[in-house]
């Protein structure tokens, strides 16, 4: 695979290899055959980052080969959304001959939605002044005149200039209901929107007929919390990143959801609070004992759950675990399988044509 060519003819074989690999990894814990959720074979990535290469008068996007570290020119990127591909051409055309926009520009980041909105961030090794703002405003207006719903941001050391806003609003059809998700520039969002829809619908399906409340750790912008709210009496969710918490609060209001409470704290801190080890001012007014959480949802970073959180989640009758790294999932399962069994297993092909796998397991208490 190269940035400008996807081996779409190999998609089925690559997916089959992942299914086999996941099944082998999970064999010590389950004999379930994974439920498999396929990605679109192209234009599946909703965000992308590129370095910029200045070559005389020419200017173009580049990526680096992971093995050789050699530079690869990228004029089209079929893994990314159609909108990103359109913007790549438009941004180069708009920046190449404009000194204020081109000088010391070293990277462009693209964030798009299925609803055809975009935030484009230009990163510089220089101070951004009024001349830059005027040139960027003219470029934004020219892009919008082409029918592109785009917002531009300039970034430099200790500087961030938003011409309008630093977010876009995604609209996803999830099990018969449209969900609105505010996505903030430079914050985590699910990269493969089509796969995100399938993950949300799978999580809804495996938690239907749930009793009690849901606790979620690492909730981000509320991606799973808000979709799952319809299956539970109440949802209590934690997140540490301020922009993600703000986006989650917006998303709660935008989706007219009244049974989700977001707390800004790390999963490790919340574990201490739940165990009565420490008290936190951020929890004033929230009576944790009122929540009857029968299910806990975790979508941890690649490192998986730490040992204290492992112990905490074992106290819940059901654990829904979305993993971006099956190796650390299996490490966690060495502990979790002492008290729980794997009742559902899914493979989500979030990153086609790579060795990366995303998977989901539902664990039920023995």
UniProtKB/Swiss-Prot annotation:
Keyword tRNA processing in annotation: yes
GO biological process entries: tRNA methylation
GO annotations of cellular component type: cytosol
Catalytic reaction equation(s): uridine(54) in tRNA + S-adenosyl-L-methionine = 5-methyluridine(54) in tRNA + S-adenosyl-L-homocysteine + H(+); uridine(341) in tmRNA + S-adenosyl-L-methionine = 5-methyluridine(341) in tmRNA + S-adenosyl-L-homocysteine + H(+)
Active site per UniProt: 324, 358
CDD domains per UniProt: AdoMet_MTases
Keywords assigned: Methyltransferase, S-adenosyl-L-methionine, Transferase, tRNA processing
Residues that coordinate or bind S-adenosyl-L-methionine: 190, 218, 223, 239, 299
Pfam name, any one: tRNA_U5-meth_tr
EC numbers on record: 2.1.1.-, 2.1.1.35
Domain of life the protein comes from: Bacteria
One MF term in the entry's GO annotations: tRNA (uracil(54)-C5)-methyltransferase activity, S-adenosyl methionine-dependent
Function: Dual-specificity methyltransferase that catalyzes the formation of 5-methyluridine at position 54 (m5U54) in all tRNAs, and that of position 341 (m5U341) in tmRNA (transfer-mRNA).
Protein family: Belongs to the class I-like SAM-binding methyltransferase superfamily. RNA M5U methyltransferase family. TrmA subfamily.
Protein name, UniProt field: tRNA/tmRNA (uracil-C(5))-methyltransferase
């Amino acid at each position: 695979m190269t940035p400008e060519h996807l081996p779409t003819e190999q998609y089925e074989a690559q997916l089959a290899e992942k299914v086999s690999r996941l099944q082998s990894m999970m064999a010590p814990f389950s004999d379930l055959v994974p439920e498999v959720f396929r990605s679109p074979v192209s234009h599946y990535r909703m965000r992308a980052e590129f370095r910029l290469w200045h070559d005389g008068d020419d200017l173009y996007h580049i990526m680096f080969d992971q093995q050789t570290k050699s530079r690869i020119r990228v004029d089209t990127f079929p893994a990314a959304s159609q909108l990103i591909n359109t913007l790549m051409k438009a941004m180069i055309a708009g920046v190449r001959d404009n000194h204020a926009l081109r000088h010391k520009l070293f990277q462009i980041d693209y964030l798009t939605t299925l609803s055809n909105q975009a935030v484009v961030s230009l990163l510089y090794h220089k101070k951004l002044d009024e001349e830059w703002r005027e040139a960027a405003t003219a470029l934004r207006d020219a892009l919008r005149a082409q029918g592109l719903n785009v917002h531009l941001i300039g970034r430099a050391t200790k500087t961030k200039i938003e011409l309008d806003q630093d977010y876009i609003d995604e609209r996803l059809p999830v099990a018969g209901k449209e969900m609105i998700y505010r996505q903030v520039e430079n914050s985590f969002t699910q990269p493969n929107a089509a796969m995100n829809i399938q993950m949300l619908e799978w999580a809804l399906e495996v938690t239907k007929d749930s009793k009690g409340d849901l606790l979620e750790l690492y909730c981000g912008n509320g991606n799973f919390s808000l979709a799952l709210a319809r299956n539970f009496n109440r949802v209590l969710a934690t997140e540490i990143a301020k922009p993600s918490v703000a986006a989650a609060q917006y998303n709660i209001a935008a989706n007219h959801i009244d049974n989700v409470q977001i707390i800004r704290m790390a999963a490790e801190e919340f574990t201490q609070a739940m165990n009565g080890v420490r008290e936190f001012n951020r929890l004033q007014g929230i009576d944790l004992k009122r929540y009857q959480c029968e299910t806990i949802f975790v979508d941890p970073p690649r490192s998986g759950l730490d040992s204290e959180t492992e112990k905490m989640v074992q106290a819940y009758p059901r654990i829904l675990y979305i993993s971006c790294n099956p190796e650390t999932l299996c490490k966690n399962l060495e502990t979790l399988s002492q008290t729980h069994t794997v009742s559902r297993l899914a493979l989500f092909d979030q990153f086609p044509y790579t060795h990366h796998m995303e998977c989901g397991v539902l664990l039920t208490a023995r």
